[in-house]
Amino acid sequence: MAATGVGAGCLAPSVRLRADPATAARASACVVRARLRRVARGRYVAELSREGPAARPAQQQQLAPPLVPGFLAPPPPAPAQSPAPTQPPLPDAGVGELAPDLLLEGIAEDSIDSIIVAASEQDSEIMDAKDQPQAKVTRSIVFVTGEAAPYAKSGGLGDVCGSLPIALAARGHRVMVVMPRYLNGSSDKNYAKALYTAKHIKIPCFGGSHEVTFFHEYRDNVDWVFVDHPSYHRPGSLYGDNFGAFGDNQFRYTLLCYAACEAPLILELGGYIYGQNCMFVVNDWHASLVPVLLAAKYRPYGVYRDSRSTLVIHNLAHQGVEPASTYPDLGLPPEWYGALEWVFPEWARRHALDKGEAVNFLKGAVVTADRIVTVSQGYSWEVTTAEGGQGLNELLSSRKSVLNGIVNGIDINDWNPTTDKCLPHHYSVDDLSGKAKCKAELQKELGLPVREDVPLIGFIGRLDYQKGIDLIKMAIPELMREDVQFVMLGSGDPIFEGWMRSTESSYKDKFRGWVGFSVPVSHRITAGCDILLMPSRFEPCGLNQLYAMQYGTVPVVHGTGGLRDTVETFNPFGAKGEEGTGWAFSPLTVDKMLWALRTAMSTFREHKPSWEGLMKRGMTKDHTWDHAAEQYEQIFEWAFVDQPYVM
């Protein structure tokens, strides 16, 4: 029999209290106190400011003891002369009395046994990783995400959630990743090794009780857990199709968040559940309901009081905003509406009677998460400004004390010029001869004149306004007057796709535009080009500049977000000699971009030793995930120093 309601694991503390007769006198009054505390919280949450989160308890403040419903009071002690009684089974009836907003139809005995075992044993199934540096403190870490490579990926979020958990597991942590099991025919093979766990739960939300099941694969020392529901089985991309975003995305990712909260309590992975002492790492709006659920539906009943949550913002532009009328569908207590409340500015409202009221998933996590991380230090500052905060800048500014930035890493198993299977020739920082050969092969593949002396500039990315394609379009006529070659790879706005095709016909010996995307081609362009151009208007982190430096390709970028953090402008007169790994220009104008490109091209032609120094400094930078994982460990430890979020 499987758990059939959210919070199935919340009875674990009560099970342990059966052995403590001293609590019997208090147990009968706990339900009344719970109702009184809910009234007090309701009054407090109603005053929650739209500009900032509720005040947190002082660090020395201790949480109230777990609430124990009267019907779970421990039985009277047995007479001394009689043998020790066996533990009575938990009652199936009356569990719903825990709280009006917490529905349980029954608890499986095997789930309860698993929770008891986890209370005394938190060892993970992590394999030996002697070659990796180990963390001083190891924890149980639960990633919650809408995508993770290689199972499902639509962008950088998938890369991060497919690599960072592996890096943390290699450092000794027990790591679980919870994500949807997307099935649309072509992706079915991605989950071929994931096995059905025989565990399922029923989630009360959106006007009904929705059953989800769990699949599991153990790979690279990580427990990959896939939440299965019919809403994840449809054609199209992960979040939408040709007609736009799916209309039920709020429902789909509400299910994911509930399931992620239950998975550590009910899934026996490697023989043990993860238990209640976890670090939840929630990624973007898809997982942002998790910290709210922990604070609203678990901690008030003694569950997950030893757990913490970290929100990772990969792109603040996507916040999961839906009409305010959908809040009751989320299954949260009414008094928690303030945590998710969102009001659109007047200019964004559709008509005069539109009040602009909405719920914002990401805001809920910003309010309730214990720590907040952006994917670069520069982006952590930008999100607190009116220009980059996407409406959440004041709230994020109020949480500066728990806001940090960590630059993403790259998978050096996939991105390594010494072993890359996509390259015709290999090279290293000690022997760069293979890079010139890769350039010649790329020129042949593209039908460009094979010339070692001409600078070859590349662009890889989406063809849209955010990536600065309009600036490239305006700069190309002037840039093509130079002795230069330019190659672009990407897809996106049909207008820019058509422009790429027409520009190629206008500059047949200088310009090539590849509409679409190909992983092998992106590797060959990264290795074969001399310069990589990234004029993004905003870039939370950016990975292409990291790939470029790893391959000895010099980046020319707009100085924003993670680009500013990772690319150091060339300085021939540094304190220790020549410094820098590329050029970061600002402000974002065509003239500034052309100046940076011409400076780079001049250095390439006239100062070969300096150019080689630029290449080697970029190749020796530590872009590994292990470096990023070490910084995440510090964030986790800071989170556990403070008390968890409570109302």
Swiss-Prot record:
GO terms for cellular component: amyloplast; chloroplast. It catalyses: [(1->4)-alpha-D-glucosyl](n) + ADP-alpha-D-glucose = [(1->4)-alpha-D-glucosyl](n+1) + ADP + H(+). NCBIfam families: glgA. It comes from Triticum aestivum. Its main location: plastid. Residues 66-91 have a biased composition (Pro residues). The keyword Glycosyltransferase applies. Pathway: Glycan biosynthesis; starch biosynthesis. It is found in: Plastid, Chloroplast; Plastid, Amyloplast. One of its GO terms (molecular function) is alpha-1,4-glucan glucosyltransferase (UDP-glucose donor) activity. CDD domains: GT5_Glycogen_synthase_DULL1-like. This is Starch synthase 1, chloroplastic/amyloplastic. Keywords: Amyloplast, Chloroplast, Glycosyltransferase, Plastid, Starch biosynthesis, Transferase, Transit peptide. Gene3D superfamilies: Glycogen Phosphorylase B. One of its GO terms (biological process) is starch biosynthetic process. Residues 1-41 form a transit peptide. Belongs to the glycosyltransferase 1 family. Bacterial/plant glycogen synthase subfamily. Residues 66-95 are annotated as: Disordered. The lineage of its organism: Eukaryota, Viridiplantae, Streptophyta, Embryophyta, Tracheophyta.
